[in-house]
Amino acid sequence: MLKYAIIGFKSACDLLLLDMLLKTVREKTPNYGSNCFFAENATLIGDVVMGNDCSVWYQAVVRGDVHSIRIGNKVNIQDGAVVHATYQKSPTQIGNNVSVGHNAIVHG
């Protein structure tokens, strides 16, 4: 089944085919809330759950391939940032109203 999201933060813009952004790993596909923005070359992988009003910017990667990642509401993951988890040891949790800066690495 194809998934679509609206491009543009809280705006009605063109539809983007999300199959290129959302990668299923071990039968887990990223989930996200309403009013989220994903840049065209951002990537979300595996066991990722993201709240409402979030944004993932250019070349940012959220890797839930080895453990879960939980992201709250109103989170901004800026350009080039990487969010990851530790293999079979610790998940990554990001609360509400958080901004992850440009090129930052967040590792659970």
Predicted regions and their residues:
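Glycine-rich, low-complexity segments
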Residues: 16-18
